[in-house]
Amino acid sequence: MLQSSNHHYLRPDYMTAAAAPTAQLDNKSSPLALLAQTCSAIGADTTNPKLLAANIEKSTKQLQHHPKGSSGSGGSGSFGLSQQASMDGSARDKSSPVSSHSSSVSTGSVEQQQLPPAHGSSSSSKPTPTTFKPYEPNNNISNITTAADCGATNLSSNNTSAQQRVKTPKSMTNGGGQRCDSNQSASSQHRESPTAAGSLRRTPTSGLAGGVMQHNGSPGLPPTASTTPGRSNSKESAAMHSPSAAAAAAAAAAQIASSNRLQEAALAAAKEANYVKALHAASQQGSASAAAAAASYYPPGYGSPYSMDLMTASSLMSPHHAMFKASAMNPYLNYARMKGLTEQSMMAATPNVCRDPYCTGCPASPHYINKAAGQPCPAGCPQCEGGGGGGGGSSKSSGSQGGSGGSSSAAAAAAAAAASSYHAQLAALAAASQMPYVCSWIGSDAAYCGKRFGTSDDLFQHLRTHTASVPDAVLSAAAAGGIPPNHPLFQRTYPTPPLSPLSAARYHPYGKPSMLPPSLAPPGMPGLPPHPALAQYFAPYSLYGPRMGSSHP
């Protein structure tokens, strides 16, 4: 298609050597050749040995023409290190060209932040060209400038001196200024031993700043490079002159903190040991020794403690120890405040105290322990109602007031009540483990019984005392299986608290009716008028049994 020489299109081979003598130009210095070299260096073309050889030759020529000495001890050390690093860089160029290119790219990016005339007029014999060559692998003057910039960026005088870079092997390779690596940060320099750091910090600040100015050779240096070493050196000199004082202060503070922690731990351990000793003594000895052991644990201002002869070993109390700690003082006072009780009513145990034997913090709960120890029962006790409960309550209140040391302050009374309730909780748990049989007898004219027994025979004998007061008509109807479903026997007139274990026996709409046998649950009579003394809680399964049929399991 391009056979005719008169064609208006150009021939594709017009740049041949014979046709175009302009191709004999210097390919190395032409802008197009420089652009081609730059583009090939971006891609890290490792298959181009001519480009790598040209870069190595250029770097070695710059090393030979650069002067060997300069004024200033810090400056000569920095220059010698950068020269050695550049030699290492040129040696690395032969082995790994990719790393040399990547390091040269980072060098160029840092070099862009410098002023072009800043490349040392005082420290170099020949003027450095101001042309920006970003992909030059080893430029000594730019390396020194980059090293100074690294020190200024890290805001520490340690990083601008070459002697401290020798201490760290990693910053030896990076000391040529190829990259502002994180290994040259002030934190990595401070990881050395204190003696070595103190000896290295003795370099004067003026010498360091002078060395930096000699290498840079320009007044356009950022002010942080000359002012920051002075600031940091003043701090370091203060730390250097008094390392023993700082270490002694830190050691004293640590010792004080550790001693405080040890004292707190010792106090807690002693209290726990006394608590466990009291429990063991109570479980192994009689009532007198148990009372003495409990008195050794409780201060005398807490009043006379309850007898702990019913306590078991510490294995019984260990699962509930956290609960005891949590409900020691304030929860009981909050509970009494919620119930509307005052300190006087708490100490006198007025009848408005809740009578749940599982109540967490009820003064009337350990009535069985009071009777076992020969102490009078508090007023409001369901067993003592109608049997001299008033006199017992007055004697109990007077005894508790006398046991508190005659103190009339409300704080002492509240502390005594809280201590007694805490002890009552321990006794209730121990009694629950030793006497599992509870009488849950409730009558329309009687309160909740709540007595505990160790065997089922004792409970059965106690139930006979309740049934003796029931009318004969009711007993005969019960024997015939015709007890009316709205009888108080099938009702819960006592509202137990939600946290009580007794609440598990209350009616639940999705529970199984295991409380009554089928013969005692006849069809209900909705038209039957309720008894005047009937409570507000009905037995729902006996009322709605015929409607459920076989739908309920």
Swiss-Prot record:
Q: Which UniProt keywords apply?
A: Developmental protein, Metal-binding, Notch signaling pathway, Zinc, Zinc-finger
Residue ranges of region Self-association?
A: 287-480
User: Is the keyword Electron transport in the record?
Assistant: no
**Biased composition annotated in UniProt, kind: Gly residues:** 388-406
InterPro entries (UniProt xref): Elbow/Noc_ZnFinger, Znf_C2H2_type
Compositional bias (Low complexity) spans?
Answer: 96-110, 121-134
Stretches for region Interaction with noc? 287-553
Q: Name one GO biological process term.
A: eye-antennal disc development
| One Gene Ontology term, aspect cellular component | nuclear chromosome
Q: Where are the zinc fingers (C2H2-type)?
A: 437-466
Region labeled Disordered — which residues?
Answer: 59-243, 388-407
Q: Which domain of life is it from?
A: Eukaryota
GO MF assignments? zinc ion binding
Here the segments flagged for biased composition (Polar residues) are: 137-146, 153-173, 224-236
* Subunit annotation: Self-associates. Interacts with gro and noc.
Write out the function statement from the record: May negatively regulate Notch-induced cell proliferation in the eye-head primordium. May act in leg and wing primordia to negatively regulate body-wall specifying genes and thereby promote appendage formation. Required for tracheal development.
Q: What family does the entry list?
A: Belongs to the Elbow/Noc family.
This chain belongs to the protein called: Zinc finger protein Elbow
What is the organism field in this record? Drosophila melanogaster (Fruit fly)
Q: What is the lineage of its organism?
A: Eukaryota, Metazoa, Ecdysozoa, Arthropoda, Hexapoda
